[in-house]
Amino acid sequence: MAKIKSLDVITVAIILLLVIADQATAITVQADCIGPCNDDCQQLCKSKGYTDWTCASFRTKSSCCCKPPRHQIFEQNAQLNN
């Protein structure tokens, strides 16, 4: 019985470590990823109204990700104060 409890504790610990490791390696990208990254990625993003693009790697493949324009924080504060 004690051996089964010990095995359960070890299993839970391993699962938690794997989840933590996966979250630590995750990258947050503020972008809309459309499809595979190729030479047409920039044209595709510009045709959809985006100003910037990047090729982001997810696990074993690379995707074309269109990034929305960044908003200046100071510009937003100035608009709120007026």
Swiss-Prot record:
Enumerate the subcellular locations listed in this protein's record, separating them with semicolons: Secreted
Q: Which cysteines are joined by disulfide bonds?
A: C33-C66, C37-C55, C41-C64, C45-C65
Q: Which keywords annotate this record?
A: Antimicrobial, Disulfide bond, Fungicide, Plant defense, Secreted, Signal
Q: Main subcellular localization, coarse class?
A: secreted
Organism superkingdom: Eukaryota
One biological process term from GO is:
killing of cells of another organism
- As given in the record, the signal peptide range reads 1-26
Q: Name one GO cellular component term.
A: extracellular region
The family annotation for this protein states: Belongs to the DEFL family.
What is the official name of this protein in its record? Defensin-like protein 75
